[in-house]
Amino acid sequence: MIRRAQLVLIALALAVPFVQGCGEPETDLVVERLPNVEPNLPAVPTLPPPPHPITYDDGSHSIFGLRSRLRNTIDTEVEVTGYIIEIYVPPECEEEPCERPLAPHLWIADTQSEDSRRKHLMVVGYAENQEQIDEAVELAERGRYEPPDPETGLLPIPTDFHVGNKVKFSGQFTRVGGSGFNNSEGLLDYRGHSTIENVAAEEE
């Protein structure tokens, strides 16, 4: 009995340091506050307005509009309004053999002063050769030009194309025209036109 009491006292004596060790207060943690991070983002860019309307009040496209909606407009019948910027004229032949001239074609743009060829739209297919145009213009000036019967399916030869004219064209917007011309951004295979502003008439 005495020996058991001694063993209990020894066990309690050994446990005292352990209890004191567990009861010691923990070391205080130092929490350091990080500085506030201010985001350095670029300003939201202001997008400029489109240079020209997609379509006009009469439903015709601008050249800008045709090409900005290329997926929807390519290989479709369209109407497009623009100014005639340049008309192809075959070069004069001074020495034989003469090179075969290109088929008649012209370029239109959204403004009269547009000088970037990439912003011009080629119009093709309104005549087979320059002789057809010259003859039709001569007859028209004499009041004797008669357009072909619509039942024939032949298109009238345009006689009022002048650089500076504002014209609404109708035709097939395509990458490859019937006259052998091609353009990856599209060209117009002519079907018809109406002249909105005629500079030749204004000069008279």
What are these regions (language model features)?
Residues 22-204:
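OB-fold and OB-like single-stranded nucleic-acid-recognition modules
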Residues 1-20:
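Sec-dependent bacterial lipoprotein signal peptides
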